[in-house]
Amino acid sequence: MEQGQDTPWTQSTEHTNIQKRGSGQQTQRLEHPNSTRLMDHYLRIMSPVGMHKQIVYWKQWLSLKNPTQGSLKTRVLKQWKLFNKQEWIN
């Protein structure tokens, strides 16, 4: 294989994000992002409301010691519905 040739792995994990700041452009290219870098990037590009919902979700995930898939789904859905209800009231 030639050096510099894209493999299916690099094609699927490369992520290019272009953000405009002021009059210039900044290009950020993440190759083989680990989960922390990917999550940081995701939180940077989300809206404030979306970011708050994601933080609430991750706090719930981390607060569970040994979650089963069913218990996790039930708990997160309950909190999500409650949060959305409060958002409509406010």
Curated annotation (Swiss-Prot):
Matching Pfam families: PB1-F2
InterPro entries assigned to the protein according to its UniProt record, in alphabetical order: Flu_proapoptotic_PB1-F2
Organism superkingdom: Viruses
Principal location: host cell
Region (Disordered): 1-34
One cellular-component annotation, GO: membrane
Protein's UniProt keywords contain Membrane: yes
Site features described as Low pathogenicity, chain residue numbers: N66
Polar residues composition-biased segments: 1-28
Segments forming a coiled coil: none
Entry keyword Membrane: yes
Ranges for region Mitochondrial targeting sequence: 65-87
GO BP field: symbiont-mediated perturbation of host apoptosis; symbiont-mediated suppression of host cytoplasmic pattern recognition receptor signaling pathway via inhibition of MAVS activity
Key words of the record: Apoptosis, Host cytoplasm, Host membrane, Host mitochondrion, Host mitochondrion inner membrane, Host nucleus, Host-virus interaction, Inhibition of host innate immune response by virus, Inhibition of host MAVS by virus, Inhibition of host RLR pathway by virus, Membrane, Modulation of host cell apoptosis by virus, Viral immunoevasion
Location of the protein in the cell: Host mitochondrion inner membrane; Host nucleus; Host cytoplasm, Host cytosol
UniProt family annotation: Belongs to the influenza viruses PB1-F2 family.
Record's subunit section: Oligomer. Interacts with human SLC25A6/ANT3 and VDAC1. Interacts with host MAVS.
Note: Is not encoded in all strains, and seems to be dispensable for replication.
Functional note: Plays an important role in promoting lung pathology in both primary viral infection and secondary bacterial infection. Promotes alteration of mitochondrial morphology, dissipation of mitochondrial membrane potential, and cell death. Alternatively, inhibits the production of interferon in the infected cell at the level of host mitochondrial antiviral signaling MAVS. Its level of expression differs greatly depending on which cell type is infected, in a manner that is independent of the levels of expression of other viral proteins. Monocytic cells are more affected than epithelial cells.
Protein's name according to its UniProt entry: Protein PB1-F2
Source species: Influenza A virus (strain A/Teal/China/2978.1/2002 H5N1 genotype W)
